[in-house]
């Protein structure tokens, strides 16, 4: 079957990462994955959470969608006086994904908050937030290195994420909203640059799926993540 935007089944949407989009944040970027656009900023504070051992740092994330990021306006979380359950789940995922490649002892007594604000959502907002959030975090670490706040980069590698799914029994990479909403199976994958899995979230939306189908989706994601990490490298090396 042909895809909505004419892509091959194993092809990413057009990806662009624009660094240093916010002059006030220690690190920032705008990531565009097709029609999904996410603003990612990294803020540095010298107050790690209380649960963190003395001398260690922490990386956390917050995620939200602008009211008109989708086809219809949604209410802001603040107007409901509570965090949307979906947003809470996604920001925990982003934080876990980024912490997986951070050496908290090398980070030292610093708290890094990654804010991911979806300007426009067309599927894959959580995975775009992880991919862009990593770039924002690395730019913040660079600024900290220049200021003498870090002795070395406290990361073990790159991290990126992408989705895949089965639509009309066909495995596809990087689903847009229309594909995602009609997918039989939906899977999100986070990996480091050594091909190691950090998190896999798979759901049988319309039917159960086999281990072979899951493996095919993970392989599609691995291909896409390698390409995303090359984009991350080019952006960070050009700075």
Enumerate the predicted regions with their spans:
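Short, Gly/Pro- and small/polar-rich lid/capping loops
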Residues: 1-32
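Glycine-rich, charged/polar anion/phosphate-binding loops
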Residues: 15-18, 24-27, 45-47, 99-101, ...
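Buried hydrophobic packing segments
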Residues: 94, 98, 132-141
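Catalytic-site beta-strand/loop segments enriched in glycine and acidic/polar residues
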Residues: 107-122, 162
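Glycine-rich, flexible beta-strand/loop modules in the N-terminal catalytic cores of phosphate-handling
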Residues: 21, 29-107, 197-219
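A structural signal for small-residue-enriched, beta-sheet-centric alpha/beta enzyme cores
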Residues: 85, 106, 124-128, 137-142, ...
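Structured core elements
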Residues: 16-18, 30-32, 39-41, 60-62, ...
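A short glycine/serine-rich beta->alpha loop
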Residues: 79-83, 116-125
């Amino acid at each position: 079957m042909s895809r909505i935007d004419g892509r091959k089944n194993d092809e990413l949407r057009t990806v662009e990462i624009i660094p240093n989009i916010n002059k006030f944040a220690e690190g920032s970027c705008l990531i565009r994955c097709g029609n999904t656009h996410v603003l990612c900023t990294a803020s540095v504070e010298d107050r790690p959470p209380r649960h963190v051992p003395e001398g260690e740092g922490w990386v956390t994330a917050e995620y939200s969608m602008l009211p008109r990021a989708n086809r219809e306006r949604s209410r802001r979380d603040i107007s409901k006086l509570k965090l949307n359950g979906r947003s809470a789940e996604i920001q925990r995922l982003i934080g876990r994904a980024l912490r997986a490649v951070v050496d908290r002892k090398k980070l030292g007594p610093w708290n890094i908050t990654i804010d991911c604000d979806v300007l426009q959502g067309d599927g894959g907002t959580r995975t775009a937030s992880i991919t862009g959030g990593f770039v924002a975090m690395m730019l913040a670490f660079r600024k900290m290195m220049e200021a003498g706040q870090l002795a070395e980069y406290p990361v073990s590698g790159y991290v990126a994420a992408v989705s895949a799914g089965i639509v009309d029994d066909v495995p596809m990479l990087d689903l847009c909203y229309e594909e995602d909403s009609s997918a039989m199976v939906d899977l999100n994958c986070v990996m480091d640059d050594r091909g190691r899995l950090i998190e896999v979230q798979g759901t049988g939306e319309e039917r159960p799926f086999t281990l072979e189908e899951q493996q095919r989706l993970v392989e599609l994601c691995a291909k896409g993540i390698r390409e995303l990490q090359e984009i991350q490298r080019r952006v960070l090396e050009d700075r």
